[in-house]
Structures are given as structure tokens and as C-alpha cells.
Amino acid sequence: METLLGGLLAFGMAFAVVDACPKYCVCQNLSESLGTLCPSKGLLFVPPDIDRRTVELRLGGNFIIHIGRQDFANMTGLVDLTLSRNTISHIQPFSFLDLESLRSLHLDSNRLPSLGEDTLRGLVNLQHLIVNNNQLGGIADDAFEDFLLTLEDLDLSYNNLHGLPWDSVRRMVNLHQLSLDHNLLDHIAEGTFADLQKLARLDLTSNRLQKLPPDPIFARSQASLLTATPFAPPLSFSFGGNPLHCNCELLWLRRLERDDDLKTCGSPGGLKGRYFWHIREEEFVCEPPLITQHTHKLLVLEGQAATLKCKAIGDPSPLIHWVAPDDRLVGNSSRTAVYDNGTLDILITTSQDSGPFTCIAANAAGEATATVEVSIVQLPHLSNSTSRMAPPKSRLSDITGSSKTSRGGGGSGAGEPPKSTPERAVLVSDVTTTSALVKWSVSKSAPRVKMYQLQYNCSDDEVLIYRMIPASNKAFVVNNLVSGTGYDLCVLAMWDDTATTLTATNIVGCAQFFTKADYPQCQSMHSQILGGTMILVIGGIIVATLLVFIVILMVRYKVCNHDAPGKMAAATVSNVYSQTNGAQPPPLGGMPVGQLPQAPPKVVVRNELMDFSTSLARACDSSSSSSLGSGEAAGLSRGPWRLPPPAPRPKPSLDRLMGAFASLDLKSQRKEELLDSRTPAGRGAGTSARGHHSDREPLLGPPATRARSLLPLPLEGKAKRSHSFDMGDFAAAAAAAPGGYSPPRRVSNIWTKRSLSVNGMLLPFEENDLVGARGTFGSSEWVMESTV
């Protein structure tokens, strides 16, 4: 019966346990321990119905993303927790706070970016921490704080770690295995492994380490099994795949006996790619430091910042230290800052900083030094021997206070000064809106002055402005002042006080002045208005000039159009040509024979006569009448008058050419008549001369330059002549040709006789011009037929 009751009780307990097991999980009750196995079940989160008495929990191979505080709450008996091969990217702080019995935590093959200081809080008995194959880029300094003394196995391989909390690693005295391979580590702090006496395996493969700090722990890698103890086991050390810089700093590692030959050097250039254990010890050398650049001298006003630079090269890279003038090593403090590149910043300088600063560059091969001379220009202060000479209530650091107490004292820098006060030695002159000339004088009995200091400020504020002036100057121009403002100014003399070994200062004098008022805005507005007025005036002048020019052109155009019909009428009246073949011309308009129509009392336009006279010579040698137009244009351009161009005329013809001949012939006859009327002898000579060359003159004509002698004559009381043109053989030949047609001939071959009608225009030629025209054609070619 008792046996039956015991079996039923055991079955009931097993049924209760199975009933509490999460879905898709397997729960095992092994004696006193309870295991919950949920590997690769496709879980997206930690099942909430897990028995809190679980000792072993396996959740690997799922898709869990987040770990919260309630996921493992009250699991105080949990010893082994496996969260491998999930997609965990975030662990809420204090999520493992209740897992005080946990011995092993597997977080490998997840997506954790970092480990915060509270991520692993509460794991006080943790011995195995596996966090490999994640995306860890950083680990907080206190992340391992709760299990530093209990941790035995730490695996951080295959991450993106650039550094580790080396101080925490140094305190893991029970650590047996440390896997840091396949990371981005480039530095290991010296002395990190000094206390890790139980370390049996150290893996630093495939990092960026260029050197390893010498440590006695690495000597255990050569210890045999006979000499090994449980407290000092032999060390398995791997550091292949690192770009080792093979210099004197790795000589200690080269002297170790190793069995593998796979390590190679990454630098320097002469040893790059060579097997580490095959390189001779003599080739592991270093270069002493060399300072390449540093500050030589520096002048700083007391209280201001100073920057001292020092750069050095060497192999390995040297460390730079600074030594103050009092042989004190300068470090980082509230007043100074030392940087890794060798720069020293003094944030606030004092008089004690004056002197030589020493830059020391040191490495494993030696050291180099350089000196920087720092000079501090001290702020003015009174020494004990000169304090009684200062005016009452005058303070060197507050000129405004000293000057405001004496506003009614005539502009002095203090109250009622004694008779020998130095304020009178300062004069301010040539005051403008933005500048003033300050002059001062010092008595010959004064100590040797090193420098003068000019202090001034505006009466509207309390900001002092300092100007350092060499001792050789006794005047200074103060610029960049504000217009219409009062200023308080003092001049101080600085010299070395042998009693206090400090720079003593005494007031030479003080003064007050006001700058002149200025109105830049009004002047600017006036200049703008003046500039705009000038632009308007110039534009108006240009527009008026253009309008006047346009009006002149329009008036001239109208005058030309008005005169053109009159010119054409004059040309029509004065150029009446007819070809009669030697016969008498018929009556004009029914008028009696021998009587010509009276032309209107006009003077023929002068430019038309010029056209005929200047183109005459060219027309005689041309075979076409088109050359006459070009001769007219040339004669007009060479004339002495620039008359408006005549109205368009019809194309020149043979009749117009004959009119030119007649004009020249009538001119010569007119001249002969004038000569005959003066002297009897002249009449006979004129008659003979007229019969000799009057017919040849029109053909030759005077040169075109004689066209300026043309003058209009009145039409009344002048004889009118008519000449007939006889074609001679030309007409007979034309009639004899069959069909009344004859081959064309040159016009020059038929100019034998002509008939011209000219009214009132004579060409006054000189006698010598007529003589020059003789001999070209015979007088037989020209026959005067009739004269009316």
C-alpha cells in the first residue's frame, strides 16, 4: 500500500511539472534539478511561463531580439543560461539581477553592440562568460565589476573591440582562459597580465598589435610540464596575424624559444614580411628621438594663455614631457594641459612662468631636449618704495575710479593733487572724432624705464584698454575711439625694482578728454543724395543733347526735301538739248522762230555745274554714259562747298553730256566778248582766238580742281546761243546699211558737231586753261552752225 501511494505521488509530481513546461519546450526533472530545453523552436521572446525553479535554461537557436527585466526574474536557482545563436541586440539593464547562482552565461552569436556597466549587474558567481561573434564595439569600464574574482573563462573573440577595460582584466586573478582573437586591438597596457598567475591560454591572434609589453607571464610559455604547477600552469600564447613592429622593443620576445615559424613582421620596411623567429637579434634596433620643431621664444602678457609646441620623431615614437623653470614636471592640472602631440597649454600665466621651459622627448633608444624661453609681461602694480608717490585713491587697475573722483578738479586723474603731482606731465592734443595724440614727459631723476603702459577707457563702460609703448617713445596716437565720448587716460612707467625683484610701476600722469561729435549717418545720407543728383543732372544733359541732335537732323531733312523740286526745275530749264542733224530746231510751244522761252528768274544750282565740269574729261574717254555719274560724284566730293545731295535725277545721257560741252563753249565766248569790249586790239585777238580753240575746249576741259571757279551769272541781258550737231558720215552710213542698221560705233568717233541750248549760265575759265586744251582735236571736227 505504501508502495502504491509513493508511485501515485511521484506520478502526480511529474504530471505537475510537465503541465508547467512551456509550449514547444522540453522539461527534464533530473533528481533535484529541473532543466528547460527550448533550442531552435522559433521563439521570438523568452517564454513567460518558465518554471522559476529551473536550474538549466537553453534558449539557443531562436529569434529572440530583446531581453527584459521580467524574463529571468526570481530565477535565483538558475545555474546555466544559454542564449546563443539568437538575434539579441539589446539587454535591458539589471535583467540578470536575480541570477545570483548563475555560473555560465552564453551570449555568443548575437548582435550585441556594446556592454554597459549595468548590463551584467548581479552575476556575482559567474565563472564562464562567452560573448564571442557579436558586434561589440566597446565595453564599459565597470561592466565586469560583479564577477572579477570569480570569472575563469572570458571569450570576446570575433568582435570589433578597439580596446578593453584593462584595469578590470588585471584584477581577474582566477582567469584561466582569455580569448581576444579577431578584434581590432592595437594596444595592451603594460602590466595587464602581471597578476594572472592562473592564466593558461591567451589568444591575441589577428589584431592590430604592433608591440607587446614585456611581462614575466610570457616566460611561462617555455615552461615544461615538469616545472608546471596548478597555480602556475604552462601558458598557451598565440599572437599571429598582427603587424608587429620589429624593433628593439620586441627583442625580449625574439629571445623566447618557440616552435612555430608563422609569425611575420609588419614593419619597418627592411624587415617587413620576414619571419619573426628568423630575424637576428642585431636587426631589432631603435632610433633615438629627434626634436624637429619647437617654440623658441614666447612673450605673453600676464594672465593670458600661452601655447608651447614641441614635436619629435624617433623609433619608437618618443613621449614628450615638459619641465617648468623651477625644475617641476608639468602635468595636467586646472592651469596647464599637456597633449599627446607634445603641446603644452598654460591657460593662465603668472609671473612664476617666466623663464626657460624644457621639452624632453624620450623613447627606448634615448632622449632629446629643447628649451623654450617664456617672457611674462607683468601687469602694473605699485612697489612699496613708490606707493607714496601715487595720487590719493588712484588704483592702477581701475582708472575710472581714480578719475571719477576728480571730475571737478580740472581733468586730473585723482582728487586734489599736490603741487608736484605727475598728472600735469600728460597732455592730450589733436583730438578728432576717432583719435587723439597723447604726449608725456618724465623727469631725469626717474629710474631707467623699461616700458610705458597706456591705459584708457570710455566713460560709458569700465573696460580698460592697454597699450604697451617702448621706452624711447614719449608720444602715442590713440586710434579707434568713439566719437562724442569722454575718455579717462593714464600713462604708467615700468622699471625693475631691485628690492622686490619684480617690475615696479609708477603713474606718469592722467588726463581726460572728449572726442569730437560726428554724424556719419547724416553725412552718408547727404553724400547719397548728392550722388543721385549728379546722376540725374548728367542723364538730363545726355538726353537734352540727343533731343537737340534729333531736331537738327529733322530740320535738315525737311530743308533738303523742300529744295529738291527747285533743283530739278532749274536743271530742266538750263539743260535743253536737241539733235537736229544740222537743221534748224522747230519752234517751242508755238513761239516764233529765233525766240527762246524765258526761264524763271532763278540761279541754277551750283553743284550741277560742278558735276558737268568735273566729269567732262572722264566722259570724253569713256565708251558708255554710265561713267558720267561717277565723275559727277568725284567732282562734287572735291569741291570747296559741301552742299546737300541733290534730288535723284535720271541717268545721264548723251544730251546731258552735250550740255556740258555747250556750257564750256559759251564761257569762252563770254570771256572773249569781255576782252573785246575793253580794248580794240583785244577784240581782234579775241576773235581770232575764238575761232581757233573754242571748239576744242569742251572736249578737254579744265581739270576737276577748277570746278570751284564756277559762278552763277544773271539770266537777264545775256545772249542765248544754239548749236546744231551734224552726224556727218555716221548718219549716211546708217541709212546705207541694209535694213537701216549699222554696227555700233564708239561715241567718240561721231562727236563732230553738236547743238546745245544753255540759258544764262557761263563758265568763267582763265585764258591759260583754254590754251592747254588745244591740239587734241582739230578745229575741223567742230563746226558752229548758227547763233541766235
UniProtKB/Swiss-Prot annotation:
Disulfide bonds join 310-359. GO terms for biological process: modulation of chemical synaptic transmission; regulation of postsynapse organization. Pfam families: fn3, I-set, LRR_8. One of its GO terms (cellular component) is presynapse. Belongs to the LRFN family. PANTHER family: LEUCINE-RICH REPEAT AND FIBRONECTIN TYPE-III DOMAIN-CONTAINING PROTEIN 2, SYNAPTIC ADHESION-LIKE MOLECULE SALM. Forms heteromeric complexes with LRFN1, LRFN3 and LRFN4. Can form homomeric complexes, but not across cell junctions. Can form heteromeric complexes with LRFN5. Interacts with DLG1, DLG3 and DLG4; interaction with DLG4 is mediated by the PDZ-binding domain. Also interacts with DLG2. Interacts with 2 NMDA receptor subunits GRIN1 and GRIN2A. This is Leucine-rich repeat and fibronectin type-III domain-containing protein 2. It comes from Rattus norvegicus. The gene is Lrfn2.
